[in-house]
Amino acid sequence: MLTTLPKVSPNSMVARVLLSFLATAGFFYVNIMPALVDGLRQSLGFSNKKAGLVGSCNVYGAACGAFLIAFLIRHINWRLTAHWLLVGLIAMDLASMWARSPYALMSVRFSHGFIGGMLVGLSDSIFARTIAPDRTFGVLLLVQVLLGGFGVMTLPLFVPKLGINILFATLVAFSVTTLLMLQFLPEYPVQHQSGAKTDGSQIPKVKLLLGLFSVFLFQAANMGLFAFIIGLGKSYGLALAFVSETVGIADWIAIVGALLVIVVSTRFGLTKPIIIGMLLAFIGTAAFRYSDVKWIWIAANVSTGIAWNFVISHLLGMCARFDTAGQTAVWSGFASKMGLASGPMLASFMLGAGNYSLLIATALVLLTGATLSSAIPAWALDRVSNAVSSTQSSTTSPAGVTS
């Protein structure tokens, strides 16, 4: 029966939206991480440390799942695999409703993350089979920011009345919806390339490692702060309703960062946009020290959100440019997830006594490290790009004909 359902055009905007939901289903808990961490504290009485570790286990599982799927992607039926992975996510979210001890929940959420990481990696491979995959990734970012902002804005308000299970029920509903959407996606066969050198022997490993390290540090800095952003706001005397609303709206405004990536593209290279974005992230993060002033709290959330979307897109794109076979793109995704997991874990050890000032200072140190690590690979890639452009310009006909 399912095979008789009409399929959307593989490269249409509708298909890109459906694919974005497929990828988001495996990682949506990250977009609502502040609601999840604060919900564990409010509903189950977890400490900052234990709530943060639950979130970290979730993302560490995703990193492991994404790592594994990279080796399996060419040997599996993506549609059948996606069905089973979505069913697995639903099962793990249902199991999370029954887990009440921190360590039981860490185990269940690690398993959930592992399954979700495989689904995200699978979805990313399908993105690469579309025409203009960058557009699909752009749609993905918009979907995640819009839904994540709405979730952070509304879900924390339901936790005091309905408990933590409202969050897991939301994740179940999202996976069920995605399972229905999956039926309308067309086939995306693997594109076999000939003559491509994929052994990685020509990749400048030191520059790549610096690029991957910058991704790791940047994601750790931002997610370490973002996971506890609700608690940070409340520690400065801000009301929960105000904190949730402003964080959610800031997430929506942060779409500007994603749109700027599309507009700017590579016309200014990598180095300048990354440095400018890092500077904005640094200033916004430092401003959280004055969160008792409401307009500064709002400005800090907006600026860091815009910078996060803007910079991470450039960092991932930078790593992907080191080869054309997609190997470095897989590794950058792995580094990203490791950073997203490590940030909340590191933060959880700092907040035993509610020391949010130390958390902010640590985020600033990590951002500085990310800036320095990204400078050399970005500059090197810009030099190569400029050299290629100069060569092409010198061989272009006076009429300026391009292929």
Language-model features, listed with the residues they occupy:
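Extracytoplasmic gate region of multi-pass secondary transporters
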Residues: 33-34, 207-248, 252-255
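A late C-terminal transmembrane helix in Major Facilitator Superfamily
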Residues: 322-356
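Cytoplasmic helix-loop-helix junction between adjacent transmembrane helices
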Residues: 108-143
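Conserved MFS/SLC helix-loop-helix module at the cytosolic interface between two early adjacent transmembrane helices
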Residues: 64-101
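C-terminal transmembrane helical hairpin of 12-TM major facilitator-type secondary transporters
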Residues: 269-315
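Intracellular juxtamembrane helix-capping segments at the cytosolic ends
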Residues: 118-131, 309-323
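Helix-loop-helix hairpin linking two adjacent transmembrane segments in secondary transporters
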Residues: 104, 130-187
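Helix-to-loop junctions at the C-terminal end of transmembrane segments
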Residues: 65-78, 257-270, 351
